[in-house]
Amino acid sequence: EAKKASFKKIIPILIEEACDELEQSYEVRPDEVAWIRKVLDYNVTGGKMNRGLMVVESGILLFGGRCTNDDLCRFAVLGWVIEMLQAWLWIADDIMDSSVTRRGQPCWYKVDDLGSAAINDAFLVEMLLFKALRRHFGDRPEYSRLVDLVMETTLQTELGQLLDIKCDTAPLSAFTLDRWTAIVKYKTAFYS
């Protein structure tokens, strides 16, 4: 629980950094910044955080438990990047699948009757995760590998989504164990 509490302390910082950058560098108005904060609060926080916490635990294991506070903070940032990746993919997935709830609450596109306007929010979350990566890893040698890893994971997940979507119109004979395995593998396995 202590690790989870430490992990949870990082996301408000990342959200604040993102909002500050949007205001200062992109002339985003306060009401729009408030909207983006709401998007991030609603979609990124509130889950079990298993993926993000696994990143922290993996980092600790890779460092043999000899981590500085800076290392732990970077692991947590990377964990939240994965949580943001999941969030933006879920926003889009819920729209495509006409889902009603996610994590026991209305899907984002159902909130305030957003509808397809939520697609832009998904794109914003995606771009903000890359901004967080640059902000916290941009001067580090592993930065380009992390960006490539996130992009590759995104592509694999989107290919899984394509397989899932194509099931809607595929004939029954197309539903094979191989196809199901590919959907499971590509839709969720790579960012989990």
Residue map of PLM features:
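Eukaryotic N-terminal low-complexity, Ser/Thr- and Lys/Arg-rich leader segments
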Residues: E1-D31
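Mg2+-dependent prenyl diphosphate-binding active-site environment of isoprenoid biosynthetic enzymes
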Residues: Y26-S192
